């Protein structure tokens, strides 16, 4: 039996695990198995809050909605291509294919809309759990220019596909209309997440160094955080239920917890709160925002070009900022170009967690690459829950007043020691 997929439900009270021989559902507080089905090779599973309704992908193109309490199938749908992801709330069911999104009324299972997208092989899509702010977010479809030509390296007869955009389209899933486009990153998107109220959007690009948070639906940038200086694949992002913290896991095997400041944003719409600065496993970076290639302005993205200007404008800004209070820096930022003023932004984690590496049992594979993970915050306690691709469920305590490194308090296994995650964590 191999693990195929793992995800938390919308309020993080349950954990669902899809395997090659059925699926399992666990409560998270306390951790205990709640339900198990031992039939079917389940590629993807999604729950609807704490109800008995689950959505299952049984074969690449076949979706089944089941009632686990009655142990019956409610409906079954077949799609033209592989189903990559499923999203649910109390009003809508979203099915993500590589180049289409199907939107259903979850009460009647009536197809409401079919949305064409740019190729989206990583199923980058988020649906707010909220019924009031029932927003869906996905990469803005790219339109190839009329004069676009296929690169020389492309095989004859193939259609060239441009990289995924760094812009996010906000779609009202009740009114069935696009309402905004958020210019999130210059690089292609890697992951997006909406909070429980549908009022905040977190975004990460494929570089994985900068995490941004925008208000929804108006798209104002509220916060910008730095995960690290070295590129990394972002695996999971999750707000806590009160939207005061954001957890982020990546291929560095460090989970970062970012604190959303209670005070107002700075003059350019970004957070002016500065949590303790930490950069785990990455060289120190004193240049902040402009150091990252993804966010560079002109040639300022190059570390060497910044060092050349040390002692001039860049050096003066760095030395001055060490002696200037946050309020003064915010006022000065209003007179500087955006790329320069954003160097004062905090962009560091408030707390962090280092994931342990477990010893694989018989048939385990230590060479399976980075330890992938899905993260969530407990609704009742200051704890971070992490499920890893080697089948472990961890609970860490964090200090909400001081931050710092989290402490491992509980550890469980969601599968046998020989099982590993072979398909994907929820992206």
UniProtKB/Swiss-Prot annotation:
A motif (L/FRRG motif) lies at residues 225-229. Disulfide bonds: none annotated. One of its GO terms (cellular component) is vacuolar membrane. It is a peripheral membrane protein. The keyword Protein transport applies. WD repeats lie at residues 1-36, 69-114, 184-224, 229-268, 308-354, 366-406. Coiled coil: none annotated. Residues 265-275 have a biased composition (Low complexity). It comes from the Eukaryota. Residues 262-290 are annotated as: Disordered. Component of the PI(3,5)P2 regulatory complex. Belongs to the WD repeat PROPPIN family. This is Autophagy-related protein 18. It comes from Penicillium rubens (strain ATCC 28089 / DSM 1075 / NRRL 1951 / Wisconsin 54-1255). The gene is atg18.
């Amino acid at each position: 039996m191999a693990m195929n997929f793992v995800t938390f439900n919308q309020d993080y009270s349950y954990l669902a695990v899809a395997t090659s021989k059925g699926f399992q559902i666990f409560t998270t507080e306390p951790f205990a198995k709640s339900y198990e089905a031992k039939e079917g090779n389940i590629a993807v599973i999604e729950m609807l809050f704490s109800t008995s309704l689950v959505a299952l992908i049984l074969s690449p193109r076949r979706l089944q909605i089941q009632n686990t309490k009655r142990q019956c199938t409610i409906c079954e749908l077949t799609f033209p291509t592989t189903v990559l992801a499923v999203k649910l709330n109390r009003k809508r069911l979203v099915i993500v294919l590589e180049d289409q999104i199907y939107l259903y009324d979850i009460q009647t299972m009536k197809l409401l809309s079919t949305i064409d997208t740019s190729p989206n092989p990583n199923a980058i899509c988020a649906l707010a759990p909220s019924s009031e702010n029932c927003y869906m977010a996905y990469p803005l479809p790219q339109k190839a220019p009329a004069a676009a030509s296929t690169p020389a390296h492309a095989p004859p007869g193939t259609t060239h596909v441009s990289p995924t955009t760094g812009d996010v389209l906000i779609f009202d899933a009740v009114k069935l209309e696009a309402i905004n486009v958020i210019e999130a990153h210059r690089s292609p998107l890697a992951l997006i997440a909406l909070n429980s109220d549908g009022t905040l959007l977190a975004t990460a690009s494929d570089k994985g160094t900068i995490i941004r948070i925008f208000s929804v639906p108006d798209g104002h940038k509220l916060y910008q955080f730095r995960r690290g200086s070295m590129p990394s694949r972002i695996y999971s992002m999750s707000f806590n239920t009160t939207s005061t913290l954001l957890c982020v896991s990546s291929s560095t095997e460090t989970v970062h917890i970012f604190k959303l400041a209670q005070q107002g944003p700075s003059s350019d719409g970004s957070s002016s709160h500065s949590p303790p600065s930490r950069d785990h496993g990455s060289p120190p970076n004193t240049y902040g925002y402009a150091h990252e290639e993804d966010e560079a302005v002109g040639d300022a993205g190059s570390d060497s070009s910044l060092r050349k200007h040390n002692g001039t404008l860049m050096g003066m800004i760095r030395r001055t900022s060490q002696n200037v209070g946050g309020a003064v820096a915010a006022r000065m930022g209003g007179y500087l170009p955006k790329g320069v003023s954003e160097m004062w932004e905090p962009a560091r984690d408030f707390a962090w967690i280092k994931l342990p590496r477990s010893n694989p049992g018989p048939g385990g594979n230590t060479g399976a690459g980075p330890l992938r993970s899905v993260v969530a915050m407990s609704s009742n306690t200051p704890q971070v829950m992490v499920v890893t691709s080697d089948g472990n469920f961890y609970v860490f305590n964090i200090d909400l007043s001081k931050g710092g490194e989290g402490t491992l308090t509980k550890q469980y296994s969601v599968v046998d020691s020989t099982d590993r995650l072979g398909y994907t964590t929820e992206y």
